Amino acid sequence: MARKSLIHREKKRHKLEQKYQLIRRSSKKEISKVLPLSEKWKIHRKLQSSPRNSAPIRLHRRCFLTGRPRANYRDFGLSGHILREMVYACLLPGAIRSSW
């Protein structure tokens, strides 16, 4: 189980990313337009002035049961360890154990 503080920090990052999403997207569109270099630098400074944690690259997917940040399956939102346990317990419909 991940520490509560790490999970809380990740939730704060997600909220901050949602808050600044439109600002970041519009700034990036403006930078991609053909503008004088001085204008691009101004827009770039505006983009850099936003908080670091508002960047989507700083988010991690976490298992919603354990909070584990690694080995996550997007389709289920679970870590590999928990996914395997749930498949063995027949809690995930349609998932088949591999056997050979």
UniProtKB/Swiss-Prot annotation:
Swiss-Prot/TrEMBL keywords: Chloroplast, Plastid, Ribonucleoprotein, Ribosomal protein, RNA-binding, rRNA-binding
Listed GO CC annotations: chloroplast; small ribosomal subunit
Entry-linked InterPro entries: Ribosomal_uS14, Ribosomal_uS14_bac/plastid, Ribosomal_uS14_CS
GO MF annotation terms: rRNA binding; structural constituent of ribosome
GO terms classed as biological process: translation
Keyword Zinc annotated: no
HAMAP family: Ribosomal_uS14_1
The keyword Zinc appears for this protein: no
Entries under NCBIfam families matching the protein: PRK08881.1
Major localization listed first in the record, in broad terms: plastid
Cellular localization per UniProt: Plastid, Chloroplast
Subunit architecture: Part of the 30S ribosomal subunit.
Membership in a protein family: Belongs to the universal ribosomal protein uS14 family.
Function according to Swiss-Prot or TrEMBL: Binds 16S rRNA, required for the assembly of 30S particles.
Designated name of the protein: Small ribosomal subunit protein uS14c
Any Pfam family the entry gives: Ribosomal_S14
Native source species: Dioscorea elephantipes (Elephant's foot yam)
Top-level taxon of the source organism: Eukaryota
